[in-house]
UniProtKB/Swiss-Prot annotation:
It comes from Danio rerio (Zebrafish). InterPro entries: DNA-bd_dom_sf, Methyl_CpG_DNA-bd, Pre-SET_dom, SET_dom, SET_dom_sf, SETDB_methyltransferase. In the pre-SET domain, Cys residues bind 3 zinc ions that are arranged in a triangular cluster; some of these Cys residues contribute to the binding of two zinc ions within the cluster. S-adenosyl-L-methionine binds at H342, M343, W344, R491, T494, H495. Zn(2+) 3 binds at C277, C310, C316, C321. It is an enzyme of class 2 (transferase). It catalyses: N(6),N(6)-dimethyl-L-lysyl(9)-[histone H3] + S-adenosyl-L-methionine = N(6),N(6),N(6)-trimethyl-L-lysyl(9)-[histone H3] + S-adenosyl-L-homocysteine + H(+). The gene is setdb2. GO terms for cellular component: chromosome; nucleus. This is Histone-lysine N-methyltransferase SETDB2.
Length: 551
């Protein structure tokens, strides 16, 4: 009969000891942080108390910590846990890691600690009163304290209740007030001065969304693929084989920024709203989008005019502004994973409501010079394979009459010249590419490669002549985003004929119509663990825009 010691030896022989203890230290650091800032949930209070009580502060080396009927064996040694370390912090964090890592995935052994949730509370009874900041007593000092959690669980962490039944979804505020729609939520957040921390996109009234559902835990190849660049860690898992993605430089944003690309004035309008930029008539930035903007920081369909967010020169209060979404960056929890077909893809770790912003498509902006004839292939150079451009999208500029005059109130044409994402290469190709350093390749070489790819991009569409003519006479050249060597998590998004994401052109760092940000939004509710996909040939956009894809 196998003894407990034998079981323990087998357990530790099958896991990464350093990785497990790194995760455990992050759990302890997170608990310490929430306790010090009075943002801990009831469950976290109990967890922290049991850890300290059961460890007996180094009087025994191995103790059992009870967590929800599960026994977790924790080895506590003197240099790792002492009264001084508990008082001053566990250990200094690596400077290259952001504070968002404190809330990162805690792996297999500590997964039930990372997914802490408040115990179900008794029904809240409402007593008539005028709401104030005292109605949300457990509100953290800053929204950053909620990073790393499921965004839709943020109200629950602040002791709200979400009641879902056949009649719909109702939120119960800590003071007992019922909130049955987004307008009531926004009014309550403004009344209680909590809108700076709990914004409207943290609430969901969709009955298809379960805020407690999350993807099953899996061994992590890397806790944060962005290595601290993203506000929320991007996990990397592979349960199929031992492969890792091709080496690339993670970029949180596109490069160069719009301020370095545009030769025109950066911003055509600015606003100084005091109402959160919710009025399309009074907010100049929302009016620039022809009055169609976010609905409580969500976007459910594509806006052909592009979407103009409030910029750095606007006088509106950023924490209250409802017209700043994309510029906040990644907020949802994503996971890059290996598919059974040995391809890389991305899935959401939590349920997502329709219209949720996911991330932008980051990469390096390159330019295709327009010329009458294509550059010839150099002798001795391999031809560019179609596989090197796995997914390309080009948006045709809407035709305009010669009498049309461009004003500040008019909206620029939607223009996404080319989006290029990396393709899966053969093992031999990967070995060849790994011999070259990313930093050693100059911008001239990249542009040269882009020029060689240009004929293949254009020839896949029958509208090549008219499209090229339009672009040549409207802009100096065609620009495209290259994420083959530098990009973000969006480079792993896959194509689907039935996508759950759509693309929206958003202007944040410039109003130049040539340089929008390419943002991804959910087009319907998405369950936790679902692969995130997008398409350049979906039916709805085909009705309004001419596009072509090359696969």
């Amino acid at each position: 009969m196998e003894t407990e010691a034998d079981t323990a030896k087998t357990f530790w022989s099958e896991v990464d000891v350093d990785g497990v203890f790194d995760e455990l230290m992050e759990v302890l650091r997170r608990l310490r942080h929430t306790l010090r800032h009075n943002t801990a949930t009831d469950r976290e209070y109990v967890q922290a108390m049991r850890i300290v009580q059961e460890s007996k502060l180094i009087r025994t080396e191995t103790e059992d910590v009870l967590l929800d009927e599960d026994i977790l064996t924790v080895t506590v040694s003197e240099p790792q846990c002492s009264p001084e370390s508990l008082q001053n912090g566990i250990e200094p964090e690596d400077p290259q890691h952001s504070t968002a890592r404190l809330y990162s995935d805690v792996g297999v052994v500590c997964s039930h600690m990372s997914s802490s949730r408040p115990d179900p509370a008794a029904p809240l009874v409402f007593q008539p009163h005028v709401c104030s900041s005292a109605c949300v007593p457990h509100l953290p000092a800053h929204t950053h304290h909620l990073l790393g959690h499921n965004p839709l669980r943020a109200p629950l962490l602040c002791h709200f209740q979400r009641v879902c039944d056949d009649a719909g979804v109702v939120y119960k505020a800590p003071c007992g007030r019922s909130l049955s729609c987004m307008q009531e939520v926004l009014h309550f957040l403004l009344q209680t001065q909590s809108v700076c921390v709990l914004q409207t996109d943290r609430f969901s009234f969709s009955t298809q969304v379960c805020v407690e559902r999350q993807v099953c835990a899996a061994p992590l190849l890397e806790r944060d693929l962005s290595r601290g660049l993203e506000p929320v860690p991007v996990a990397l898992v592979n349960t199929v084989d031992g492969a890792r993605p091709r080496e690339f430089r993670y970029r949180r944003e596109r490069w160069p920024h719009g301020c370095f690309l545009s030769a025109e004035p950066l911003y055509s309008v600015c606003c100084d709203c005091t109402d959160g930029c919710t009025d399309a008539h009074s907010c100049a930035c929302v009016r620039r989008t022809a009055g169609a903007a976010y609905t409580h920081q969500r976007l459910t369909h594509t806006l052909r005019t592009g979407l103009f967010e409030c910029g750095p020169w606007c006088g509106c209060e950023r924490s209250r502004c409802e017209n700043r979404v994309v510029q906040k960056g990644l907020r949802v929890r994503l996971q890059v994973f290996r598919t059974p077909e040995h391809m890389w893809a991305v899935r959401c770790r939590d349920d997502l409501d329709a219209g949720t912003f996911i991330c932008i498509y980051a990469g390096v902006v390159l330019r295709l010079q327009q010329s009458s004839e294509c550059p010839a292939e150099r002798s001795g150079e391999p031809a560019v394979s179609d596989d090197e451009v796995q997914l390309v999208e080009e948006w045709r500029i809407p035709e305009e009459t010669h009498t049309h005059t461009h004003t500040l109130d008019s909206s620029p044409p939607l223009h996404v010249p080319v989006i290029q994402r990396p393709a899966e290469h053969s093992l031999a190709q990967r070995r060849d590419q790994q011999q070259f350093s990313i930093s050693s390749e100059t911008e001239d070489n990249r542009c040269e490669q882009a020029l060689r790819k240009k004929p293949r991009l254009m020839e896949s569409n029958g509208l090549q002549d008219s499209r090229t003519h339009t672009l040549t006479h409207t802009h100096d050249g065609v620009y495209y985003l290259d994420a083959s060597r530098e990009g973000n998590v969006a480079r792993f998004f896959t194509h689907s004929d039935d996508p759950n994401l759509f693309i929206q052109n958003v202007f944040t760092d410039t109003h130049d119509p040539q340089f929008p940000l390419i943002a991804f939004f959910t087009c319907r509710p998405v369950k936790a663990g679902t692969e995130l996909t997008w398409s350049c040939t979906n039916t709805e956009q085909q009705k309004t825009e001419e596009k072509h894809c090359s696969v």
